[in-house]
């Protein structure tokens, strides 16, 4: 059984429905639309939630893993979760890229947010400690900050961190290794209000 969660976001989109079928690098474009429908599916008869009819084992607690991540990651990313639905072996989510939010962050906030996900690098650690950086070091750090700001508004990075975390927990619980997800997530741009409403 699916659990659907929605947040009311008022879209300002075109009136004509369009479906994008380009490669992923072209598919996700904030210039086209900030809204995307993403789907990830499990492999090897793995369970994301629900109960295995053969063994009787319940995996319903895994729903909580995914929900927790879906609600916490937007606190770090400039990406909002507009809706999601969790099925036994896959999940859907509607994501909204908030690029204006990412642009509003100062460099220090970008570094602090990135450090919630990764360790950063030596320069970013020194920067947060308040160490004095040389001009060359500051320029090098700025390159990293610009890249991190971009990643913090990237659906690919959002989904990567989300799915890797769930895969690690599930593989540990199942006492196995290998892929938990069926390849990379699938995404579709929601280019108008009709598409967004239908998906929600």
Please tell me what each predicted stretch does.
Residues 1-200:
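Short catalytic/metal-binding and nucleic-acid-binding patches
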């Amino acid at each position: 059984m699916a659990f659907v969660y929605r947040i009311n976001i008022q879209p300002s989109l075109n009136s004509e429905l369009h479906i994008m079928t380009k490669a992923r690098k072209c598919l996700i474009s904030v210039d086209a639309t900030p809204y995307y429908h993403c789907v990830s599916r499990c492999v090897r008869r793995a369970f994301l939630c629900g109960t295995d009819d053969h063994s009787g084992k319940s995996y319903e607690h895994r729903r909580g893993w995914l929900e927790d991540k879906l609600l916490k990651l937007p606190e770090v990313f400039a990406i909002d979760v507009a809706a999601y639905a969790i099925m036994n072996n896959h999940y859907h989510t509607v994501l909204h890229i908030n690029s204006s939010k990412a642009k509003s962050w100062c460099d220090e906030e970008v570094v602090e947010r990135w450090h919630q996900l990764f360790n950063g690098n030596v320069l970013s650690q020194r920067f947060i400690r308040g160490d004095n950086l040389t001009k060359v070091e500051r320029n090098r750090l700025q390159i990293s900050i610009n890249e991190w700001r971009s990643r913090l508004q990237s659906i690919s990075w959002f989904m990567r961190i989300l799915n890797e975390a769930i895969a690690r927990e599930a593989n540990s619980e199942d006492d196995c290794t290998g892929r938990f997800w069926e390849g990379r997530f699938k995404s579709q741009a929601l280019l108008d209000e009709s598409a967004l409403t239908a998906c929600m």
